[in-house]
């Protein structure tokens, strides 16, 4: 049992991370950095995973690809990728190439950093991104991408105070965040990442880093150490409560006092139908995206009973305010999934937020399920994302209320008795 400031107790268990591989981050990162190419050194398993997970056919010529490791490569000191890189440059003309690791070459002890340095040129740098599922879950790989981009962020001079938002969001959400900051009188230095490689924000000793995703602690620490920047430790801008606190805390960093309680009240009123459905509902969050703590905090504020809020990894300093807001909730790091399964059977929550891997088994047991990955892919940040966020939670409850009673026999038809 771990103790954190504010008497929040975190139960740490010993399970493996039930999460997508870090390579899944390619799905949103290549779309965000439009002049990039993501190259994965991996196996046929990696290729099948990406094609199925991202739903991308090869003739679409997406800006990501896999250099396959074959049996013959096992006897080589290092894989040779010069021809692959030349082909990528000819077909896509990227400004930057990200070289991602995967499990098999990690086990083979491939020197990815040396390989990236060898392939890199001044015109087209090749940046190593550790993303192996042996070490990282799929959201942490975004942290690795931003980590690799830090040397390409210009150094902002001392005295030039501005905010840089950390985290990949779509352009509409980025525009909303920028407009809100400027309306409050906060100077915006940019976003890490920006949509183009040559537009990465200048970061210096008077830059305030405002993380908008809860899994970017490593890049924040790197910027603090190397640039002297300061990280905003606040709630994340999910839901009316988190968005209000986020903007009030950020404004305070710039010497601006704002009171956004009326704005928060209006946002809650917009989702009154959704909160009425959530009120009193028991919700269980299993570990997957590392977004679980702010999502659990929003659910609690919306009137739901959060039975358990678990996450693969919990950085206690980075998430201190979220943890404080969850006082009294069972918070678990690296949860034991078998224990969770038994607890869920016993507690019978009204909604289980879980990974794609475990969703169907829970449905088979008669539970209402929400895929946690959907929160990664939808615009749920800030004031503009409040309705989308609330709808993500209530949509499965809505759907179940319109369906006939669950027929377990349909799921088990033709299955051997031992499988029940």
From Swiss-Prot:
Catalytic activity: chlorophyllide a + oxidized 2[4Fe-4S]-[ferredoxin] + 2 ADP + 2 phosphate = protochlorophyllide a + reduced 2[4Fe-4S]-[ferredoxin] + 2 ATP + 2 H2O
Gene Ontology terms for molecular function: 4 iron, 4 sulfur cluster binding; ATP binding; metal ion binding; oxidoreductase activity, acting on iron-sulfur proteins as donors; oxidoreductase activity, acting on the CH-CH group of donors, iron-sulfur protein as acceptor
One annotated GO biological process: photosynthesis, dark reaction
Binding positions for [4Fe-4S] cluster per the UniProt entry: 21, 46, 103
Group of enzyme by EC: oxidoreductase
Keyword Nucleotide-binding listed: yes
Annotated pathway: Porphyrin-containing compound metabolism; bacteriochlorophyll biosynthesis (light-independent)
Cofactor binding, note field: Binds 1 [4Fe-4S] cluster per heterodimer. The cluster is bound at the heterodimer interface by residues from both subunits.
Cofactor(s) needed for function: [4Fe-4S] cluster
Enzyme Commission numbers on file: 1.3.7.7
Top-level taxon: Bacteria
Key words of the record: 4Fe-4S, ATP-binding, Bacteriochlorophyll biosynthesis, Chlorophyll biosynthesis, Iron, Iron-sulfur, Metal-binding, Nucleotide-binding, Oxidoreductase, Photosynthesis
Pfam family, one: Oxidored_nitro
Family the UniProt entry places it in: Belongs to the BchN/ChlN family.
Entry function: Component of the dark-operative protochlorophyllide reductase (DPOR) that uses Mg-ATP and reduced ferredoxin to reduce ring D of protochlorophyllide (Pchlide) to form chlorophyllide a (Chlide). This reaction is light-independent. The NB-protein (BchN-BchB) is the catalytic component of the complex.
Subunit structure as annotated in this protein's UniProt entry: Protochlorophyllide reductase is composed of three subunits; BchL, BchN and BchB. Forms a heterotetramer of two BchB and two BchN subunits.
HAMAP family: ChlN_BchN
Protein known as: Light-independent protochlorophyllide reductase subunit N
Native organism: Chlorobium luteolum (strain DSM 273 / BCRC 81028 / 2530) (Pelodictyon luteolum)
Organismal lineage: Bacteria, Pseudomonadati, Chlorobiota, Chlorobiia, Chlorobiales
